[in-house]
Regions:
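Charged catalytic cores and adjacent phosphate/nucleic-acid-binding surfaces used
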Residues: 2-42, 51-54, 106, 129, ...
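Flexible, glycine/proline-enriched loop segments at strand-loop-helix junctions
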Residues: 48-57, 82-86, 121-122
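Conserved phosphoryl-transfer catalytic core
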Residues: 56-83
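Phosphate/oxyanion-binding loops and surfaces in catalytic or ligand/nucleic-acid-binding neighborhoods
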Residues: 14, 72, 102
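An alpha-helix initiation/capping motif
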Residues: 1, 85-93, 184
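Conserved acidic, metal-coordinating active-site core of Asp-based
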Residues: 88-152
Length: 234
């Protein structure tokens, strides 16, 4: 959450609304689940504790993956640190950027597909909070949790609708329907789930920098959904 203050100041300077948010990697019975937490409280002790535990595990995992990948590709921990900049933690995108800079892959997406994905021999799992616990923690702190790219099955296993029902019961507020990894059929199915469970229908570019194909401004959240998310703040 270190960049939220700077982002808020920049948004104010250019006259646009700013919605603070973080993405939290979680699990459900071995399946990776990503939560978007809008309007998080950076000082709330429960959020701080959850993120600190996850951050430490991510760094340990990144170091082990660098050791594995470095045996076959031009990659060192120092390379990764150069690409992580002032980030609070080190994750797979930083490994991907270092591999691209070394000429091992053309794009970040290529690096993920070949060596960084969950089905890769180089992949190392790491601790992530159980998603239902994470939702309760976020809601208890006043944040607004949204399930990110719930149908992105090209990335690995996805949870079934019954789990989304459990998440909604735990306090989930929104379901990210509009996403580049969702087909039109998936978007329709997810929109129906969101309506049935009274979840806010959202969208997002999932833009994490220039290393991926995602473009700012694609798959946006509607003004009505934005207002519904604002109304859900604790």
């Amino acid at each position: 959450m270190a960049g939220l203050e700077e982002a808020a100041e920049t948004a104010a300077a250019i006259g646009i609304n700013f919605v603070p948010g973080i993405e939290v990697s979680c699990t459900y019975e071995g399946i990776s689940v990503h939560l978007l937490a809008y309007w998080p409280d950076p000082s709330h002790p429960d959020i701080v504790a959850m993120l600190n535990k996850t951050r430490a595990a991510r760094i340990d995992r990144a170091m082990e993956m660098v050791a594995r990948i470095g045996a076959d590709y031009p990659l060192t921990w120092d390379d990764v640190l150069r690409h992580s900049g002032n980030a609070e933690t080190v994750g797979r995108p930083h490994l991907a950027d270092a591999l691209v800079a070394a000429g091992a892959f053309a794009t970040r997406d290529d690096a993920f597909a070949e060596v960084l994905a969950g089905n890769s021999d180089y992949f190392v799992p790491h601790y992530a909070p159980p998603v239902l616990d994470a939702i309760r923690t976020l809601r208890g702190s006043g944040a607004v949790p949204v399930f990110a790219h719930p149908g992105a099955d090209a990335r690995g296993r996805v949870v079934p609708p019954t789990v989304i029902e459990e998440m909604a019961a735990a306090g989930l507020v929104g379901l990210e329907v509009e996403h580049r990894d969702h087909s039109e059929v998936q978007r329709g199915r997810l929109a129906r789930i969101a309506e049935r469970l009274d979840l806010v229908h959202t969208g997002a570019s999932d833009y994490h920098g220039t290393g991926k194909l995602n473009q700012l401004g694609e798959n946006v959240t509607s003004p009505a959904s934005y207002q519904a998310l604002r109304a859900a703040r604790g």
